[in-house]
Amino acid sequence: VNMNSYVGRIVIYPSTRYDIWGTEDPRVYKVRGKLYMTYTGRSINYFSPIRVNRTVPVTAVYDEDLRNWIKRFVFMPSARVFGRIITDKDAFLHEMGDGKLYFLHRPHLIDDTTRLMISKLDPKILSMGGMKVEEIELDNAVEVLDLMPFEGKLGWATPLVNIGDKKLITLIHATDKEQLAYRVFAAQLSLSDDEVVLEAVTPRYIMEPATPYELIGDRPLTIFPCGAVKISKDEVVISYGAADYMIGLGILSLNNLMAELDKGRIY
């Protein structure tokens, strides 16, 4: 493993009521040729005893002319559909091959459960003009997958590839109840107007903390994939947070991953 240090520039920092207490866990990706970043904003309610909307997913768009990130959307689950939300995180937009737009997110509900959910969005929101942050109400959702008895929580990690118009392979992270260690598995989903179908899940975790910089750090035993770039027909580079202290890069073989998914195929 090669280890190097690089100079970085802060491009997103607290500046609104939606992220005044912190900006964290960014996912950077492309939709319709544009760069988007969805991150978790620690909102003005973060330390409030009321426990409502403490964190919210904020999406910024990269402006090629300004060469800067512009905060454009904050996604708010409808109280009518979700009830009261304590937090919402592990989120990103994703466009399928048929042009349909989805929002993958992990709300923490008032009953103290966390839910791995997908909401449909109108693609027209991407063309909304202006420079201010727009609140987008999420008025629908499908729960995708529940916890295993030994898991503490699940969260969306990063999407990998679309297969055709309606299928998506994505990474999901899970924590165990005993050590609170993060591990990663993959799932294949089929998305349509009527339903979300979980077609396959790897029968074992495909990534777990192993190296010293993943085992020891500000948040030990943590590997947290946040990005993926396909570099060849078979290979995807994964970027991940390591123990909340370093950034790791790994290479994933899609052929090997599909073989693992076939072992856990449901449909």
Go through each PLM region and give its residues.
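Beta-rich carbohydrate-recognition and catalytic domains
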Residues: V1-I20, V31-T87, H94-G152, N162-D218, ...
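Conserved positions at the start
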Residues: T23-D25, D88-A91, G155-A157, P225
